[in-house]
């Protein structure tokens, strides 16, 4: 039996998520078929809401619904201590630990020559500006320890 076109499209869209293969995408799609109309509408509303309301913080490039984000605008945070992460979602586990009291800077990726990602594609100019224009006493690198990480760091001229 062939999968109906609309269902196949949903499977395809789910399979575009990182780490989601065809079988998982099918399970998700089949599960949605069991949703009530209200549950389906709630999912649709949540997807629309996140696309309309979530943006990048103009200071750190983390996810936010206000600008600057709650972390960057919080007066009790140590703005001299900056934790550099690769992606906005890397902030959440650090925050969950409750240990770090500084602010963040998101690179929006990591250098990967094989994927064609060089320093120009990363958020390094903004980091350099923060270092030069703010009184930053500590820069903490919380990036993935891969062989190209050392290439991601800005150097002084």
What do the PLM-derived regions correspond to, one by one?
Residues 11, 44-47, 128-131:
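A generic alpha-helix structural signal
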Residues 145-148:
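Gly/Ser/Thr-rich loops at beta-strand to alpha-helix junctions
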